[in-house]
């Protein structure tokens, strides 16, 4: 579609630029003609633009005609036209928000017009949408429509039914101003650039920079802009400011500013064109007459008093501030003035910069400067970079979203992403495509809840109902009878419908039907958590399972408008994601979208169009996920733009103060038009574009369906997942340039370079991450400042220090990632995939999947949804899967639930709300008994184990030592800046030149920045990580090692962490044992051995190397075998097994038939649960003996044991062959048993667990045991591990009823928690942190993953099924020895001590340098005693290497095992060493460290000042004095470093080496000249006798960098003779 005037503008601009270039050096008249040609097309657009501005401003300020003025003679303007579709604006004729009330009066006569195919009123837009016939004359039809609408409007007015409150449309999609405004501004920029080039070529005089300063004052003063907007509106203000700025730039011949603005406007034009294209494509569907019109009902206005005149600030999309408004009692949007009013980082800085520039300009005038100085101050404070960075990000992001089909109604919303603090997700947006049964109830015999559920679900999906079980009835002729549906409502809907299941005319049950959750709901919530914003979910029916994934929830029916307002008032700007479905069409949703700072609505083609939204996406959540992922990037882009603006202002101010800005007289100089402010703006522009492109390049999220597979029949599951054709995997689109490079990399010549190139690319990425440090921008600005006032070499030196720090950190990052990848690769799992015929019916394929014998062994990573896997004990489940076959199946799910006992599994569906989900297998669980086949339903990030990592809201990783150093840096930097300012001020007081004074101040401020801090932190953590890795602890996140040094509370998961998750026999008791016997007898006792032998006979023996059928069998047989070996007996070698009955949960016992020898009597041996075995036993006194038996069982259970009863009887049932013995026959005979005794089993504790717990308690650390086991088991295990015997056990149920304060208080006092869920584990860790504890969480399962991530230090124990815990952990223990945890804590303390001493060296030394420089400047000749290079040399010799040596060296000397006579003595020494380290003072960077820094700084300054004073007040040269001070400065710091680590050979060698390097630098001519540290005079006597002579003020040179320092070195050697001095005077005399 063509936009009127655009072609004219482009053609005129092109001709104007060409004529300007041809003008060359012609007369000014020709240049003026060229400018006129360039501007003429812009002037042609003045009329339409002014008209639009007037209309917009009238709407903005509420200007209307008189309420009594008739609309006669007025015709509706055309707002949009594309092809056969035309939009007429009804607002000028019917100025009220309820256009739909008179829709029928408008639509009917328009539809009767010849050539009109369809017409309807789009009430929310205030438009009449007309679709013309293909063969109709569009112009005639449009004129007739205008006449008819005008007549209808007049009739309505005369009928007196018009009320005309102030109103405006929600949005104005397709408004040509969206392109015309930035296009006009771009044309003005081109005019300004043409005028500038013409002025350069024609050598025309330029206007003073006060002209540009005045334009900048208008353009960048928020108060001034607000005043203009109140009079001209947004569009008028935008055009006026663009014209003012372009005129000022053209008159002053400034090229950089219009060039940057042209780039920015080009981005806005491309963004607006993309939005317009999307509107053209989606308008027929969005403005369709078949869509329902949302009802509009009055709501409470937020405008205040009724008499208050409502206003809004609507504008074209190009202005980026459009608000969607209907006032006068309908949907309250723009009069809700809080929308978008909260200032973001850019707005905050703009206000500061506006005030600061005014203050700077006033100061320049007061100090005696002229208007040019004041103008320079104003121009230096222009926050251009802040604006352009955000605009570039939003424009590129908006264009990218439009390219994927997302409709952005308000581009200003993209500019507000950086200030979002709350994300509200409406459950309506999480609706999937298919209906789902949420609750089922059976009402007739043969129709239980599960049967009703599966039949109703099949009917909803158009599938055949599954075959009934023997006790169920067939579903022939089943249908759903829906309850009457309610229409659209003004109250929030819940998305729930009711239906009866009718079979053969009879109602057999009822169901509640909602919708499946969108597959992108989980990625959406996970992305929302990563934004750092508060995540709030408003439920609808079916979203209850997502409660644990958000910060807070609200029940269905909660008013969304009220919720958004409250959250915005309480927490800040709100981003709302919702959808308007047909059954959700309420004004509550539309109003909430209107007032949300950013409103995102999913489009439902069957529902009303959400015109109040800022962005309308497609029908799924994929685009919403991308928008959420842009939040942190937008925030970072704005903050980066603000930092660049600050740096540009600082450098511009420095140029202004030193006068360097005035030295460039050539108007075409690159340095003149790319000043620091423009350079910062250009950098921000590129950075913003790059950030937006990074968001757009993010891969699409992986869908994670939440279908209730456990409640569906296996046949239904198989038909949905594997029954149909499976789509081929499609690779994502790869840019052409990447494909070309990839093809070239496989060429024979280039192939060897692939590996190094990939490594370099990875190193570059890692280095870029390391540069994200608060010191980086400070050092970058300092380097630029050094280049401005000092030397380029000084700037390169500073930049080199930054680069070395970043590369070193990047290398460490790559090493850690490679080690982690190697660990995970070693634990790659293989799985058997069943080969299923591809060509067959679904039912036959299912049968093949269940019974086929052909399998293929593949990597677990290659599994896809729909694959069938074969599993047996003791394999780990590789993915979430629905069971198809389960033979005596028991699964250990402790990694998910924390419950150490195996759970039984089944194939039959379970209730939809059943939390056990017995028909499912979950990734990471372990098969402990039986055999299974299952169909994969989820892999990778879609599994329950991986979701557990992000299942809890507000989980953040702990801050590293860098965060602590940032706090210290924020305290130190003001001191260094103050030192630089003091040096400058003192130099000026001593009558030094302004340039030299500022140069000295900058040198001090830059060189005193402790640039070694990031490197110290990186290397110290690297050293600690390497030492821990060598001991069996892989450090995945080295930055958390610092927290290890401060950990005071260690939380342990029990199952699989402190225990091996493997059962062992603890005791065997004869039936006659006393109930309260304590201690329990040993299994080697004769009576106990008989019980254990009988239990072993009842256990199922392994066959053909397949392993044990059950974990209890394995434990009992292992104990019996060990017992036989210890007793040196034959054991049960004579026991002959005749038949076996394996354990089944439904049966409750295992049995075996056998005899001793060949002639023995066949015996039936049973072992099983006491509640199953005891009723089958024959007791002498049933009442007393049964009570005694229960007492024994209860006593053993209180010890945390799993109890099995063992019984026997003779077998006289005939056949005893295994294949002929039926389990039912055994069950029938298993009565009148003789009770033999009891076997107690328990989870096996790791051998290192108790010593670890005891050592931690001895080191005054708090130990917390968290488990999902029964409280009795938890108490027993705690006692076994060394915790106090009287420790109280707190259950999850007790925690659930407590508020946060009571929760924290209880957690601080308790040591054992039982029956806790994964969410409660996180709550326990969080409660401990609120109490001020520094926590470590040690775990091995997915149920520990969120708590591991929440803790200050997360520690994962490597083992079966522990991938989720490893993925969330900062440190992974790679072997079974938990004792390495003590080494980790010691390393944390050692690292902290090293960092603390290194920080003392770095910061304390810099403090001393600043003090020495200030004193030297005050009492010297007005010059700093040392310069930038000298201070960098000092930092290199005293900070870089000595401080790093201290950082990587432990303060605590570890005992040498060779010094001790025995291993026990060495081990005792090691224990004492660890204890001494751990019970020492807690390391910190607070007051104690500050005292050390001050002490070192004072000592350093005193030593250097003393040496400098001796040199100054004794005969000698000025350079000799400076060298003496510099040498003393270095030696004083090295001496203090030696005292810090006098036991470390590395530190001693580094200190002595640094001293030697200093001597070498001083005595080596070339190096001494470069560094500015001249060597000692070879004739000390002559030097001491020569009087100090200083050249007069007129002879002082003002050169910088290498030249000035080389001159000073030559001068020191030449001052001994008058002849040489005269030559120096002639050579370096200042030119007149």
From Swiss-Prot:
Mg(2+) binds at residues 1340, 1344. The chain crosses the membrane at residues 148-168, 177-197, 358-378, 637-657, 673-693, 778-798, 968-988, 997-1017, 1401-1421, 1432-1452, 1547-1567. Coiled coil: none annotated. It is found in: Cell membrane. It is a multi-pass membrane protein. InterPro entries: ATPase_P-typ_cation-transptr_C, ATPase_P-typ_cyto_dom_N, ATPase_P-typ_P_site, ATPase_P-typ_TM_dom_sf, ATPase_P-typ_transduc_dom_A_sf, HAD-like_sf, HAD_sf, P_typ_ATPase. The keyword Amino-acid biosynthesis does not apply. GO terms for cellular component: cytosol; intracellular membrane-bounded organelle; peptidoglycan-based cell wall; plasma membrane. Its main location: membrane. Keywords: ATP-binding, Cell membrane, Magnesium, Membrane, Metal-binding, Nucleotide-binding, Translocase, Transmembrane, Transmembrane helix. PROSITE patterns: ATPASE_E1_E2. The keyword Chaperone does not apply. Pfam families: Cation_ATPase_C (PF00689), E1-E2_ATPase (PF00122), Hydrolase (PF00702). The active site is at residue 1053. Residues 1573-1601 are annotated as: Disordered. It catalyses: ATP + H2O = ADP + phosphate + H(+). NCBIfam families: ATPase_P-type (TIGR01494). This is Probable cation-transporting ATPase I. The lineage of its organism: Bacteria, Bacillati, Actinomycetota, Actinomycetes, Mycobacteriales. The gene is ctpI.
